[in-house]
Amino acid sequence: MEVEGEVREKEARVKGRQPETEVLHGLPQEQSIFNNMQHNHQPDSDRRRLSLENLPGLYNMSCTQLLALANATVATGSSIGASSSSLSSQHPTDSWINSWKMDSNPWTLSKMQKQQYDVSTPQKFLCDLNLTPEELVSTSTQRTEPESPQITLKTPGKSLSETDHEPHDRIKKSVLGTGSPAAVKKRKIARNDEKSQLETPTLKRKKIRPKVVREGKTKKASSKAGIKKSSIAATATKTSEESNYVRPKRLTRRSIRFDFDLQEEDEEFCGIDFTSAGHVEGSSGEENLTDTTLGMFGHVPKGRRGQRRSNGFKKTDNDCLSSMLSLVNTGPGSFMESEEDRPSDSQISLGRQRSIMATRPRNFRSLKKLLQRIIPSKRDRKGCKLPRGLPKLTVASKLQLKVFRKKRSQRNRVASQFNARILDLQWRRQNPTGTSLADIWERSLTIDAITKLFEELDINKEGLCLPHNRETALILYKKSYEEQKAIVKYSKKQKPKVQLDPETSRVWKLLMSSIDCDGVDGSDEEKRKWWEEERNMFHGRANSFIARMRVVQGNRTFSPWKGSVVDSVVGVFLTQNVADHSSSSAYMDLAAEFPVEWNFNKGSCHEEWGSSVTQETILNLDPRTGVSTPRIRNPTRVIIEEIDDDENDIDAVCSQESSKTSDSSITSADQSKTMLLDPFNTVLMNEQVDSQMVKGKGHIPYTDDLNDLSQGISMVSSASTHCELNLNEVPPEVELCSHQQDPESTIQTQDQQESTRTEDVKKNRKKPTTSKPKKKSKESAKSTQKKSVDWDSLRKEAESGGRKRERTERTMDTVDWDALRCTDVHKIANIIIKRGMNNMLAERIKAFLNRLVKKHGSIDLEWLRDVPPDKAKEYLLSINGLGLKSVECVRLLSLHQIAFPVDTNVGRIAVRLGWVPLQPLPDELQMHLLELYPVLESVQKYLWPRLCKLDQKTLYELHYHMITFGKVFCTKVKPNCNACPMKAECRHYSSARASARLALPEPEESDRTSVMIHERRSKRKPVVVNFRPSLFLYQEKEQEAQRSQNCEPIIEEPASPEPEYIEHDIEDYPRDKNNVGTSEDPWENKDVIPTIILNKEAGTSHDLVVNKEAGTSHDLVVLSTYAAAIPRRKLKIKEKLRTEHHVFELPDHHSILEGFERREAEDIVPYLLAIWTPGETVNSIQPPKQRCALFESNNTLCNENKCFQCNKTREEESQTVRGTILIPCRTAMRGGFPLNGTYFQTNEVFADHDSSINPIDVPTELIWDLKRRVAYLGSSVSSICKGLSVEAIKYNFQEGYVCVRGFDRENRKPKSLVKRLHCSHVAIRTKEKTEE
């Protein structure tokens, strides 16, 4: 009775908080029992069984009554929606009891818990026979409204309602069997609430094998087992705290067949029918697929080893198809599984891994077979139709999956755990969106593992895998920071920018259109005055630079080479982005591979190529003087050549020739002549030349345009007058005569990517061409259709009127371009492969030659010499691959027009010397730390408006000196600032010195170096000569008074003692015929003071100056002890970057040069002979030093080539030496090379390859009286002059010679220097490492 009272109290409490349920009529006792069962809260310790202690009425009820009570529950409508197959057959009680063990099967729980579209009952019952015991007792404390069960078993003695017996189609059946998605959540919440209210008595129970509901009659074995288990379940009074599952027998075969009903996207539900054979039948009418091994019961544990987790997983609403596909994870048709079916942490443990992974594929081969069975073949894909919401790669209409349990042998424990872990990771069930990164991080790595990874982290090692030059990368900055392990963020280096003012940009645009625009000199009076000052300043800078460089780098005035315009265009292709010695070697390879058949006499270099000289007119274009300027060693003249046409009209063509070449004549005739006196090959004027004025002594008449210029033209001789132009300084009037008529204004547009230029030509003769073009909007510019220019019309215009240029020896091609054009591009690329960028350059060269043939009919660009400079510039810019710098090189060096190319050397020098102002640099960046320099085009924008008024000769020499100065002194890396003659004006040097001195205060005026200079016999007081520091750290100018004060003599107190001469040698006394030794002091007589001639010739010879009048020499040269101690120069001096060879200058008529080509007339460099040291071989790096044992023993000469002592003795006895011939580069190139030979130095020679390998035996008597010089051999001019003093560099260019390559006279190809002549230190190190 006490128990019943407690039950009633609980019942009252529950009624107060739960809605009333419908009462079952006719069964009052059972109704109260079920109410007690419904509202009874079971403790969390045990909720596995029905509590019989709290339900006393249940002890007195028989099984029939219990079944009748269950049948009454079914009759109220709780079983509506169950499958028809399960309702038609009777199922024993034990099957109902054992069916709860299928909770671990995903198909009996989560995927079958789909709500169905049926009428829900307002009653809420505890014993829903459609639910498994696991679902019945495993509930939570939540309270929800009851939902109709999914599957209802037919109970004995009762039948379903009329609605259940109503036949329905497959689609309706699937809908009733599944339920609506919205009701699934409510029903599961209700079950959790019911489970939380139950109490399970602690009864011991026998392990029961799980059974599967199936259609038809059950097997006998299953029915017998069901009877036994049901009787045990009815009579048991005690249960264990922890019930253990029983594994099915391994021979038991179970398979599941699915039924898919294809509905709309919102009504896609499927019903599942469990057959008695263990299959799940689907409602589809298609054929069943073959059974496939699948992990259907992968989470059935081996036994109850721990308490079941109370909190369940989150539920999802995935259909049965997606849940099935989530197990296989096969891409688009992957099985989707809810989180409710995921195994717990205890189930994933390695201890139970065998039971968990029992039905999964053991390897990838079985997985492959599984996928082959699931994914249909092409035949099956054709006939199947998939719903819109499902993937269309697999057919999931019918799947018959089979699970086989076989007895297996015991495996290795370690291997099993490892494989189980791998398989578990591979088959881990995931959400549809995938596992988050945070979950992966937490599962994969622990704190200790992360700490270990950070300890093993190496930034240097990890940085190797990162791409370079990435702005977000972290790198170690410099060595000082690298030692401290400091990390700085990498930032891309930015180039400094030139500070361009608007006026400079305006004039630059005008100069790009025409050099004779009115606005070039300024738009107003103030601007004109400003431009005049700017240009005068830059003219002074240019002249000062040229004057200093002449002293150091030698004379580099204009001297024309042979070659055509096509040669120069191809030459600028090859000189892009590479050193000059590499590009020149590439061109020499092309010339050797495609030689030109010379029709001219090889000895014509010593003949006058224009031999018909009748008159030569000397023209001095200097307006200040009326006489010609003094001739230098190799002066340059402007020759006037006549070309007679059919009408006897003479077109005088201005060409360039040296003093050793003959000049063409001007025949006197009373006829019209078109004279081209401009040295830049532009038409100047049409002039009526009077024959009498040509022969007479008067001035040549000119038109009004050249009235000012005519004043400076005078006739020097009447019989033979030379036409000479002093172009070192040209008045501004000459520049205005660049062309006679104003050219048509053009608007030029350049496309760098496609390298094609088009222009819009506007013909307007009324308006001046110097007007500034109007700016167009971008839209109008895009809409305007650009027309291509007909360049062939420009050629026809230049050749019209019989003015076509005929090819001469000086304008002949140096390469057979037609043969090169017909050659395969790959062959051309292989020829210039040593230069680099060979494939791209080969394509550009061939495309350029094809363009000439296509547009002009021949490979000839000599007509560009006769067109206006602006037109020539536009045409060259239209060639693919030529930029502004390349075009300016062709115009200045080949067409001889006014231009100034700015290459990398010129741009770097202009910035360092301060010629080009830069925008303010960052505080931490100093001038000497600059690694990148402004864009060359911006440098040219600033320089060209200020240098455009210079003449072509000055611009040529300035350009030649600047590029050589950049190679020798002002290199990009480690410039030779100590020996630089321009360091007083260099900002780079000032910044480096100031940084080295840590910005010390400026030196005071008294901080100067004083040198006492004493005269030997003078009684005057010593004079102090003050040398200011070469570094100008301050720019303040001193007054003249201050300078004069510093030069005042200093009076010494006491005075320095005079030198005493106690004893003199007899040689110190002068001798005379009449008076011998009359003077005690040989230095008293001023007439006999030794005279030292400081010139080039006397400086190299040690002969005494002979007085021819007296017959004997009274002048003696005092040889100091220091001079006497200077050793004799060796034949070969090997250094790190260069090798010095003692060479002899060979005259042109020397017998040694028999078989060599005659030296070019314009070539100022002679042939040289380099002597071999006895015992040297071709590969000898150092002179031999070993001694011969055979010669020391019996004075017998050996026959070894490397024996120094024996070979020296043999050469001394035979009076012969071995030598190699050095050929002048201009002679080796036969006087023709692109870009006027600026690739080479003025004193450059090539080593004859034949005599370098097989030296020539030369008698010593033929060379003992020859002039001796020093030849510097190395890999490049920069490496040769690196680290030398300014005196050594000066001697190198003025007295010495440079050699960087060999030359094969047979095939005319460049060769590398043999090791005897020069071997780089890199090759020496490589050889030493190889020998070690």
UniProtKB/Swiss-Prot annotation:
Keywords: 4Fe-4S, Activator, DNA-binding, Hydrolase, Iron, Iron-sulfur, Metal-binding, Nucleus, Transcription, Transcription regulation. Gene3D superfamilies: Helix-hairpin-Helix base-excision DNA repair enzymes (C-terminal) (1.10.1670.10). Belongs to the DNA glycosylase family. DEMETER subfamily. The keyword Amino-acid biosynthesis does not apply. [4Fe-4S] cluster binds at residues 970, 977, 980, 986. Residues 1-29, 137-242, 280-317, 739-810 are annotated as: Disordered. Residues 223-236 have a biased composition (Low complexity). Residues 497-595 are annotated as: DEMETER. GO terms for cellular component: nucleus. InterPro entries: DME/ROS1 (IPR044811), DNA_glycosylase (IPR011257), Endonuclease3_FeS-loop_motif (IPR003651), HhH-GPD_domain (IPR003265), HhH_base_excis_C (IPR023170), Perm-CXXC (IPR028924), RRM_DME (IPR028925). It comes from Arabidopsis thaliana. Residues 1-23, 787-810 have a biased composition (Basic and acidic residues). It is an enzyme of class 3 (hydrolase). GO terms for molecular function: 4 iron, 4 sulfur cluster binding; DNA binding; DNA demethylase activity; DNA N-glycosylase activity; metal ion binding. The DEMETER domain, which is present in proteins of the subfamily, is related to the J-domain, but lacks some important conserved residues. Binds 1 [4Fe-4S] cluster. The cluster does not appear to play a role in catalysis, but is probably involved in the proper positioning of the enzyme along the DNA strand. It holds the Pfam family RRM_DME. Residues 301-312, 763-777 have a biased composition (Basic residues). Potential transcriptional activator that may act by nicking the target promoter. Catalyzes the release of 5-methylcytosine (5-meC) from DNA by a glycosylase/lyase mechanism. Disulfide bonds: none annotated. Although strongly related to DNA glycosylase proteins, it differs from these proteins because of its large size and its unique N-terminal basic domain. The DNA repair function has not been proved and may not exist. GO terms for biological process: base-excision repair; chromosomal 5-methylcytosine DNA demethylation pathway. Its cofactor is [4Fe-4S] cluster. The gene is DML2. It is found in: Nucleus. Its EC number is 3.2.2.-. This is DEMETER-like protein 2. Residues 137-153, 739-753 have a biased composition (Polar residues).
